[in-house]
C-alpha cells in the first residue's frame, strides 16, 4: 500500500484538477468532485483491476459513475491513470472535446457508461453485475472473476430507481457489486436533511446488503471497507462514505468553503478558486499538472497491473486451450455481432395475437441464443415473454444458470439493468411489459439510445383493445412518443431507436429477425393483445425489412392507398372488399417501421407511397403517428382522446375501427379530394 501522505496528496491533485476544469469552463460542479476524490484515488491507484494497454479486456473490473455531474472527478482520476491529457481536461465542456459536461460511454478512455440522470448509473452497474454472474455460470470463474464498482450520491438514493436496484441486487445476492455512496448531505438547492430523513444504512440492510459506514475522506477506512467488500461472498456491499462537499475549498476571505451548497453547481470563482488551489498545494497559474509523487504511485500501479493482468491472461489462455468450444463461443458473444438464428424453426399460428407470435420467436431464441437474457416486470404470462421462460428458468440467488430475469414491478430498474447487462458485454438482453408502462421506461430508452446499446424493448397490449381494463391501461400517445426516437439521430448518424409494430404473426417473425440483427441501436417491438387476421396470401413478409411495403392483393394504379401498422392493417383490409365493389382500386401498405422506410431509396419510397397519391391512414394511436406517411394531402383516422373500458370488439365499433368505417371514411376522403 502507498504512504497515506502521498495518497492524500494524490486526492488533492484530483481536487485541484477538478476545480480547475470547472473554473476554466466557467461551468460545472466542483463540490462533489472534490469531496469524492479520496475514494476515487484509492480505488484507481490500489484496487481497480484493468489492463492499461487493453481497455476493453473482458476480465477487467468495471466502474460505473452514477452522478454524472461529478465528471471532473472522473476525468481527473482517469488522467492520473493516463487516459486523458492535461489538454483534454482544459477542454472540459467545450465543443468537440473528449471531456463533455457529463461522461459519455468511451471504453478506450475508461468510461463504462454515459451518466447524468441520477439513479440510472448504479442500475446499469447492477445489470452488469448480473451479466458477470450469468457469464460466470456458463464460462467459469477463470474468465469471469471481476468486480463491478458503482459510485452513487445523495440524489441517486433519493431517486425512486434506488428502491428497485436495492431490492433486486439484495435479493439476488450480487456479491460482485460494490457501491460507494458519497454521502455529503448537500445537493444543488438544499441540504439533504430538508428533503430526506431516513436511515439509509438500515434500508439497505433490510434489502440484504452488506453495509459499511466510514469516513469517506479517510484513506485507511476506505481501504478497510474495500478489503471487506471484496471478501464478501453472499451480498452486494454498500460503503456509506461520509464525505465533505468541497473538501479543501476556501472562500475569497480565506475561511472554509467546505460543506456549502454554493460549491455544488458553480465554479469556486475568483479569489476563492485561487485560495483553494494554493491551500491544496497547487499553483493557480499552472494548475493543470500531475505532481511527481502522484505520478509515481500511478506508475507503480501500472506495473502492478502488468503482473496481475499477465497472470490472469495466462490463466485465460490455459482455459482457452482446455475449452476451445467455449472459448470460441465466448469470443462470439463478446464480438458485438448479431447471433446466428435459424428463423425457419419459428412456427406461427395464423390469426394469433402478435404478442403470442412474439412468444414463438422468443422460444426459439431461448434455444438458439445461449447468451440471451429475457426479462419481465411481473408480466411474463401477459406480455408473453414466458415463451422464453418456458425454455429456461429464472435467475435466482445462488443460481445464475437460468436466463430469465424476473425484475418484479420495476419497469425503469428493469430497463436500466438490462442495458447494464449489455454494457458489460457478452450478453443480449430483452425485456417486456405493457406498452402503456413504457412511460416508466423513457429515461432508460433515451440513455440506451444515446449510448447506442442494442437492447430489445418488448411492449405488448399496444392499443385501446386492452379493452375492459380501461384508459389507464390503453396506450394512445405512446406510439407517437416512441416513434419520435426514430426521427432523432444518434451521434453516429443513425436513427436513435428502431421501432417495429408488426401487422400479423408472420410479420412478427421478420420484425424479431430485424431486431436481433440490429446491433447498432435499441429496438422497440410493439405487439397486440388480441388476435389479428393474417395478411392476404402471397404477402412477401421479407419486405418488412424495408420498413413499409405493399401487401399482396393490392391493385395496380390504385385510386387510393391505405396505410397502417399493427392490427389496423387487417382492419384496412376488411374495408377493401366494399371499396373494390364500388370500382375503387386500392393499395394496402403495411408500415411496421417508418424509420426503416425513410432509410430506403427515394425511388422505393415513391413506389410504395407516391407523393401525389391519395393516402388514407388508420392508427389506434394519435393521428400524428401516421402523418409523415400520408403526407399533407392525406387523411388519418386515429384516436382523439383516451380510451374507454369495454370489451375490445365493442370499442372497435364505438371508435370506428371496422371495415365498414374504413369504407365510409375512404369514400368521404375521395369525395373531398
Report each predicted region and the residues it spans.
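Conserved residues at beta->alpha junctions
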Residues: 152, 213-216, 409, 502-503, ...
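Conserved beta-strand elements of the Class I
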Residues: 149, 373, 561-563
Amino acid at each position: 500500500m502507498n504512504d497515506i501522505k502521498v495518497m492524500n496528496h494524490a486526492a488533492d491533485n484530483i481536487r485541484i484538477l477538478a476545480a480547475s476544469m470547472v473554473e476554466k469552463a466557467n461551468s460545472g460542479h466542483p463540490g462533489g468532485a472534490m469531496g469524492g476524490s479520496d475514494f476515487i484515488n484509492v480505488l484507481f491507484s490500489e484496487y481497480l483491476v484493468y489492463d492499461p494497454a487493453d481497455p476493453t479486456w473482458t476480465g477487467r473490473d468495471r466502474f460505473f459513475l452514477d452522478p454524472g455531474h461529478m465528471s471532473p472527478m472522473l476525468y481527473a482520476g482517469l488522467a492520473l491513470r493516463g487516459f486523458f491529457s492535461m489538454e483534454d481536461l482544459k477542454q472540459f465542456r467545450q465543443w468537440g472535446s473528449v471531456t463533455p459536461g457529463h461522461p459519455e460511454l468511451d471504453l478506450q478512455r475508461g468510461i463504462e457508461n454515459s451518466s447524468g440522470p441520477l439513479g440510472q448509473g448504479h442500475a446499469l452497474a447492477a445489470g452488469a453485475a448480473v451479466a458477470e454472474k450469468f457469464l460466470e455460470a456458463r464460462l467459469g470463474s477463470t474468465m469471469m472473476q471481476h468486480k463491478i464498482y458503482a459510485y452513487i450520491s445523495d440524489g441517486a438514493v433519493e431517486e425512486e430507481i434506488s428502491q428497485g436496484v436495492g431490492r433486486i441486487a439484495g435479493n439476488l445476492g450480487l456479491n460482485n457489486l460494490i457501491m460507494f455512496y458519497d454521502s455529503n448531505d448537500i445537493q444543488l438547492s438544499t441540504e439533504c436533511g430538508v428533503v430526506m430523513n431516513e436511515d439509509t444504512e438500515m434500508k439497505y440492510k433490510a434489502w440484504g446488503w452488506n453495509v459499511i459506514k466510514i469516513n469517506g475522506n479517510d484513506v485507511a477506512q476506505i481501504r478497510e471497507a474495500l478489503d471487506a467488500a471484496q471478501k464478501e461472498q453472499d451480498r452486494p456491499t454498500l460503503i456509506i462514505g461520509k464525505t465533505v462537499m468541497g473538501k479543501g475549498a476556501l472562500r475569497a476571505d480565506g475561511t472554509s468553503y467546505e460543506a456549502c451548497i454554493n460549491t455544488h453547481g458553480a465554479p469556486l470563482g475568483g479569489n476563492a478558486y485561487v485560495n483553494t488551489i494554493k491551500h491544496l498545494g497547487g499553483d493557480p497559474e499552472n494548475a493543470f499538472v500531475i505532481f511527481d509523487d502522484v505520478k509515481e504511485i500511478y506508475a507503480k500501479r501500472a506495473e502492478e497491473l502488468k503482473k496481475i493482468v499477465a497472470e490472469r491472461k495466462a490463466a485465460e489462455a490455459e482455459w482457452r486451450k482446455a475449452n476451445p468450444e467455449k472459448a470460441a463461443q465466448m469470443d462470439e458473444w463478446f464480438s458485438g455481432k448479431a447471433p446466428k438464428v435459424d428463423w425457419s424453426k419459428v412456427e406461427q399460428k395464423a390469426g394469433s395475437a402478435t404478442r403470442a407470435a412474439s412468444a414463438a420467436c422468443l422460444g426459439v431464441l431461448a434455444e438458439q441464443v445461449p447468451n440471451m437474457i429475457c426479462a419481465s416486470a411481473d408480466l411474463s404470462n401477459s406480455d408473453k415473454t414466458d415463451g422464453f421462460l418456458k425454455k429456461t428458468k429464472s435467475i435466482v440467488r445462488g443460481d445464475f444458470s437460468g436466463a430469465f430475469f424476473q425484475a418484479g414491478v420495476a419497469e425503469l430498474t428493469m430497463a436500466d439493468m438490462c442495458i447494464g447487462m449489455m454494457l458489460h458485454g457478452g450478453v443480449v438482453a430483452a425485456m417486456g411489459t405493457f406498452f402503456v408502462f413504457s412511460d416508466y421506461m423513457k429515461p432508460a430508452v433515451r440513455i440506451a439510445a444515446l449510448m447506442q446499446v442494442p437492447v430489445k424493448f418488448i411492449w405488448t397490449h399496444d392499443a385501446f383493445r386492452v379493452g375492459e381494463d380501461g384508459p389507464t391501461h390503453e396506450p394512445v400517445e405512446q406510439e407517437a412518443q416512441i416513434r419520435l426516437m426514430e426521427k432523432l439521430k444518434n451521434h453516429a448518424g443513425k436513427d436513435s431507436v428502431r421501432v417495429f409494430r408488426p401487422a400479423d404473426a408472420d410479420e412478427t417473425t421478420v420484425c424479431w429477425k430485424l431486431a436481433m440483427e440490429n446491433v447498432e441501436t435499441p429496438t422497440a417491438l410493439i405487439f397486440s393483445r388480441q388476435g389479428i387476421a393474417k395478411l392476404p396470401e402471397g404477402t412477401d413478409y421479407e419486405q418488412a425489412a424495408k420498413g413499409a411495403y405493399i401487401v399482396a392483393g393490392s391493385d395496380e394504379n390504385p385510386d387510393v392507398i391505405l396505410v397502417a401498422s399493427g392490427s389496423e392493417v387487417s382492419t384496412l383490409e376488411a374495408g377493401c372488399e366494399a371499396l373494390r365493389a364500388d370500382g375503387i382500386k386500392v393499395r394496402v401498405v403495411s408500415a411496421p417501421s417508418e424509420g426503416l422506410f425513410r432509410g430506403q431509396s427515394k425511388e422505393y419510397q415513391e413506389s410504395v407511397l407516391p407523393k401525389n397519391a391519395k393516402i388514407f391512414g388508420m392508427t389506434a394511436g394519435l393521428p400524428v403517428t401516421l402523418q409523415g406517411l400520408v403526407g399533407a394531402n392525406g387523411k388519418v383516422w386515429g384516436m382523439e382522446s383516451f380510451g374507454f373500458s369495454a370489451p375490445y370488439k365493442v370499442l372497435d365499433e364505438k371508435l370506428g375501427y371496422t371495415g365498414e368505417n374504413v369504407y365510409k371514411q375512404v369514400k368521404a376522403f375521395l369525395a373531398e379530394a
